[in-house]
Amino acid sequence: MIESKGETAPSLNLNDVNVEENDAAQSFAEKVQRFRYQMKVHAAPRQKTLHSFLKKDNANIHDFTKVEKPHIRSSKSKVSYNSITSRVTKYFEEKNNSVDQLHSESLTPLSFGHTIPKKKPLLMTASVSEDSRVRVSKRQFKSKVVHPEIAISIAKRHKPKFPLSDELMNVEPGFHHSNIGCQITPYLWISSFRTNVYYLIGNEGDLLSQQVPSISGELNMLRGVCTRIDDDNRYDIEQAGSCFGMSVFPTSDSGEESFTTLESDPIVNCEHDEKKVADNLLVPQVMCSSNISTFFRSPGGKKLYHYLWKNSNALRISSNDLLEILLKHGVYVSLDTLHSWLQERNVNFEK
């Protein structure tokens, strides 16, 4: 006890402090319990937080929700003096001594600015040696043999040219005749159906010959060997396919159903003419009606089918014209097979 001017200092009662702390803790526990009850029963207080049920003036309970927010930088960033516009402005000011000329009315908006020159497109060509590739401009590649990957990408970028309705040829939207020329040879692979001319390609990407398909030519294609025109030497198609990075030469389009049948009769290797081959049916895999059904199930065949038979009562189809269409799309069948296929489906046709 300290005495000062006859007065005694008030004594500090520790029990009172403990009671106040207990009351504060008890009130806090009650508020938490009430908050949990409201969160379970009512839907509206779910948006509230725990600190909204606490008294702000309660000094004994630490308000842990007050977290010091980091300093928010202003949205306006400093002007970059290294941008394209600032660099061009600086160059223009150095070139023109008078700065006032920059803002004069005599200058037009087009007289000042930054333009990026467009580079000419470069294409790779396959030369005599496979390793050496010459880069040429777009104007020069018409007289060159373009690399197959470049040729395919160019052909895919071209817009397809649809034929007239009376031609009934190449109705598949992916097929088109390119404007580049016959010297770019991998058209046999990028067309939706087999083209009416086979391009024979050498190991170095050169065009060896062109061959119109026939039944005998189709037999040679199925055997994997095709004969050069006016030459006894045989040309290995598998070797030509490996020249373009292809392990197996595709006799039909990738992604399309192959024109093969369930029959397992082997193709007889013979030297007969086309008439005897057709009469003796030595090629059952080619001269089969299921090839017609397979063709009309393909995307291009569906379009042709709907075009021909959208009004079958009013439209009478000539079987010779239909056979010519099938032959041009790579489906080789005899006329009798086509007649039987049409009769099974009750399609009106003219012989």
Swiss-Prot record:
GO terms for cellular component: cytoplasm; cytosol; mitotic spindle; nucleus. GO terms for molecular function: endodeoxyribonuclease activator activity. GO terms for biological process: DNA double-strand break processing; double-strand break repair; double-strand break repair via single-strand annealing; gene conversion at mating-type locus. It comes from the Eukaryota. Disulfide bonds: none annotated. Coiled coil: none annotated. This is Uncharacterized protein C1322.02. It comes from Schizosaccharomyces pombe (strain 972 / ATCC 24843) (Fission yeast).
